[in-house]
């Protein structure tokens, strides 16, 4: 086999692995109840090709998405492989902006969970009242609502608000996380979403809340790296895939 053929096979295998993981991510978002019919989106950069991405077929529910149904697009949002489905134009504006500005990011995950939107509408945003919140706050930004994300002129502001952070609260809109892998982006979202759920439960008690000392919050990032043994989302991801295998392995199709 020639070197060119070997390289082609490696590229195809890498893309297929990415497709399986991204389809798994969509199924997990649906499993945890974070989906919003067909109106949110998760994208992944194809390794070795900074200009091609995978994103959901617009019109498919997240629990229907499979590895083969994901749409491959270029930096302009044009399909580079046959697909009967379009892509969400708002999704492309958000995702293309981040992928273009952050070459370190492989995956961008965006949801409209009720808890996330509720916290995004609170002036104080995410409060340091739980361990989950301290983890999220270690790398969290905020982006003001500008309407449905269809305009390219919003991209610089979105990118600036994210900066080098891992997560973004989109005011009056939802939550967004990024990661060097699909696993990292998913686990970051799991933590942020859980922090929002805890905050709303705590606030519903109608009593004064105890907040974590800012000095503790500032040291959380190194603590997390120690707890995960530097593995990030990869520590939990295999178990999540095993869960999907038990529930419905068709995501790999």
Predicted regions and their residues:
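Flexible, glycine/proline-enriched loop segments at strand-loop-helix junctions
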Residues: 12-15, 81-89, 139-149
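An anion-binding catalytic pocket shared by soluble metabolic enzymes
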Residues: 19-109, 116-127, 133
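A conserved C-terminal secondary-structure "cap"
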Residues: 2-16, 21-25, 166-253
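Divalent metal-coordination and catalytic microenvironments
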Residues: 44, 98, 112, 158, ...
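N-terminal cap/leader regions of alpha/beta-hydrolase-fold enzymes
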Residues: 3-5, 70, 142
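Short coil/turn connectors at secondary-structure junctions
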Residues: 49-51, 102-106, 131, 137-140, ...
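A contiguous binding-surface segment within folded domains or other stable secondary-structure elements
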Residues: 141-177
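Class I SAM-dependent methyltransferase SAM-binding "motif I" and its flanking Rossmann-like core
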Residues: 114-156
